[in-house]
């Protein structure tokens, strides 16, 4: 049997035509063709001549030059050039196989809309989503609901997103997560481009290095896989594990470079660090976990600063560390850890060493030691002792062990001395060469003689909590956009009821 209606041809074994209703039903080996652009086969078809809607059922197979579709029940709307199905369907185009429980095909737009258990299978990637719009000419997919993209070197999770399947790049939002290059990257918005080996994230981002057991957070970040590097700014903070304790590092900009086994972290501009027993600040920081080295560095002084800065000005600019009650500054500070146990092992300060500790028994007294070079050792991750050499000077308040009455202020110089610590504060001082000095009654020592040249107590700069690592500039609410894109206008028009 054959029926021709306004450009559509239906062939079948049996046919029933209802002229009053302008309705046609074909049964058995049905073939529906529309010019040379569409061919459909099925077991039965019902066709309404008024609405030009065909309902095909049973082993439905629709072919077009750029795709084919298989399902059990398919509605074909010839007026709106649209096909839709409520039964599981499979679409195959030149590059991919797409499956879903429900779907729509907009022929003029060359667009698919899939809903419920959507899958795109491609030799290079797989896409799973609750709902997906796919444009065949541009190879672009728009994702809605829980979605997952798995490529050869990456995995993306999101609840909203755009994915260019030809170029393997996209923008992902709402609980977006990227697994890439042994890292887990999260952010309110993620951008990823496989060909460039590049990823970017903005707002509430975190980068977890699964091999080095470290985390970097911030509000903007970029990852360059070929260069083995990542850059994080806007409230940037790194968390590294040292001796089963978290070391928090904040700076304006954090840069992680190098392969996993030789990862180096650099921090720039207003660095602040926080650990349970250590606090610190510096202009910049260098951390190499492969050799257990952390350096706190200062920005080189300008020629004008060199000419006009006092020793106190220099000490204000120098890196500073606080170990419990002790403040230590110097031109460069180094912390060294055991690479096997990750426990702190030693401390080095080169140039302008200055140690200050508030005297707990006097109102305004400070224990002070300064010199040229410091070498310190840790015991069970606590600072145990330090040796200071080169032009060493000391101001120290001495007390009677029995009644804790002040004996006087010891003001001494020598070539080298050793300090031992107990319970987080100076416990004993040993002069390693003959000292030169005296003990003065406090009232006989003028106040300006009770502090060494260059003295500056920087306790107001000491961070006590994670929030103290940040300042007003870090509380900025404006964050950079990665790339803007718009979803198709019909985002919410596809529902189950629309196909009943």
Predicted regions and their residues:
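N-terminal amphipathic/hydrophobic interface segments
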Residues: 1-500
């Amino acid at each position: 049997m054959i029926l021709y209606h306004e450009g559509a041809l239906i062939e079948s074994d049996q046919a029933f035509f209802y002229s009053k209703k302008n309705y046609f039903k074909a049964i058995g080996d049905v073939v529906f063709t529309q010019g040379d652009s569409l061919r459909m086969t099925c077991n039965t078809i019902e066709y309404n001549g008024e609405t030009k809607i065909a309902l095909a059922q049973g082993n439905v197979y629709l072919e077009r030059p750029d795709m084919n579709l298989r399902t059990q029940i398919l509605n074909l709307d010839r007026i709106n050039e649209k096909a839709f199905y409520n039964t599981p369907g499979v679409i195959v185009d030149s590059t991919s196989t797409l499956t879903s429980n429900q779907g729509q095909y907009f022929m003029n737009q060359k667009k698919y809309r899939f809903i419920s258990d959507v899958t795109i299978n491609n030799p290079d990637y797989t896409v799973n989503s609750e709902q997906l719009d796919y444009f065949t000419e541009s190879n672009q997919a728009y994702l809605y609901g829980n979605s997952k993209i798995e490529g050869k070197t990456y995995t993306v999770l999101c609840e909203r997103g755009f994915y260019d399947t030809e170029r393997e790049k996209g923008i992902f939002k709402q609980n977006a997560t990227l697994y890439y290059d042994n890292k887990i990257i999260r952010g309110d918005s993620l951008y990823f481009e496989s060909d460039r080996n590049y990823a970017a994230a903005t707002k509430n981002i975190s980068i977890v290095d699964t091999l080095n057991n470290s985390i970097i957070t911030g509000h903007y970040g970029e990852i360059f896989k070929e260069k083995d590097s990542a850059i994080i700014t806007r409230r940037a903070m790194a968390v590294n594990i040292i001796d089963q304790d978290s070391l928090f590092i904040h700076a304006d900009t954090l840069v992680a470079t190098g392969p996993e086994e030789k990862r180096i972290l650099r921090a720039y501009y207003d660095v602040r660090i926080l650990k349970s027993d250590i606090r610190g600040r510096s202009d910049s920081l260098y951390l190499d976990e492969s050799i257990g080295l952390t350096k706190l560095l200062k920005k080189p002084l300008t020629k004008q600063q060199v000419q006009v800065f006092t020793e106190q000005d220099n000490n204000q600019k120098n890196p500073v560390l606080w170990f419990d009650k002790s403040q230590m500054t110097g031109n460069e500070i180094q912390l060294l850890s055991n690479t096997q146990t990750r426990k702190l092992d030693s401390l080095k300060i080169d140039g302008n060493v200055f140690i200050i500790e508030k005297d707990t028994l006097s109102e305004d007294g400070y224990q002070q030691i300064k010199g040229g070079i410091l070498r310190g050792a840790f015991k069970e991750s606590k600072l145990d002792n330090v040796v200071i050499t080169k032009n060493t000077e000391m101001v120290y308040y001495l007390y009677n062990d029995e009644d804790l009455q002040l004996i006087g202020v010891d003001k001494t110089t020598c070539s080298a001395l050793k300090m031992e610590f107990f319970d987080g504060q100076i416990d004993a001082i040993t002069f390693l060469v003959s000292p030169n000095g005296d003990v003065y009654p406090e009232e006989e020592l003028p106040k300006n003689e009770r502090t060494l040249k260059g003295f500056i107590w920087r306790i107001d700069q000491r961070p006590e909590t994670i929030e103290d690592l940040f300042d007003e500039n870090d509380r900025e609410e404006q964050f950079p956009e990665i790339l803007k894109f718009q979803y198709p206008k019909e985002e919410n028009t596809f529902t189950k009821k629309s196909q009943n």
